[in-house]
Amino acid sequence: MELKVLNIQGAETGEVVTLNDDIFAVEVSEHAMYLDVKAILANRRQGTHKTKTRAEVRGGGKKPYRQKGTGNARQGSSRSPIMVGGGTIFGPQPRSYEQKVNRKVKQLARRSALSSKAAAGQIVVVEDFSLESIKTRPVADMLKNLGLAEKKTLLMMPHYDNVVSTSGRNIEKLNIQVADQASTYDILNSQAVLFQKAALQKIEETLG
């Protein structure tokens, strides 16, 4: 698949890049993408949820009332799970939600995600650019010129650029990632994937 390279004004530069079929034209594996995205979202969870059992709730050492003669069911503690203010039975406890995905499955998932975007015509290539100072306006103008201002856009960069990353941080629908660090979730959660030209080479080195 060939794509025209655009400049930040949205005009064609006359240059054409060829997408690697081993990355952008593979048979899409929905199961691999499912496994990877599920693991990514699970691994984001803190797992710090906690409720107290009857052993952990403060108080309740004294028997609420005598064993016999009241007509009520016998009770040994006011912190019993059936009492108001009592402990919780089988409540959530701190745990790890970490899920492991094999490296080959992760790579297949990323290739599948990129291939699905390529098939849908949702990949755009722009010439390499940099900013002299931190300003949101140039990045916002570039997205507008490319017709991506209203779309959830993933900008793939060849390397980390603090000026560009900080400039685009305040744009709600823009996600900026270094090409070899963008996850399957980042790709699938976007409506358009915007590659700097050099980022294509970076992704080929990673997934090729």
Curated annotation (Swiss-Prot):
Disulfide bonds: none annotated. GO terms for cellular component: ribonucleoprotein complex; ribosome. Residues 69-80 have a biased composition (Polar residues). It holds the Pfam family Ribosomal_L4. InterPro entries: Ribosomal_uL4, Ribosomal_uL4-like, Ribosomal_uL4_dom_sf. Keywords: Ribonucleoprotein, Ribosomal protein, RNA-binding, rRNA-binding. One of its GO terms (biological process) is translation. Transmembrane segments: none annotated. GO terms for molecular function: rRNA binding; structural constituent of ribosome. Part of the 50S ribosomal subunit. PANTHER family: 50S RIBOSOMAL PROTEIN L4 (PTHR10746), LARGE RIBOSOMAL SUBUNIT PROTEIN UL4M (PTHR10746:SF6). One of the primary rRNA binding proteins, this protein initially binds near the 5'-end of the 23S rRNA. It is important during the early stages of 50S assembly. It makes multiple contacts with different domains of the 23S rRNA in the assembled 50S subunit and ribosome. Forms part of the polypeptide exit tunnel. Belongs to the universal ribosomal protein uL4 family. This is Large ribosomal subunit protein uL4.
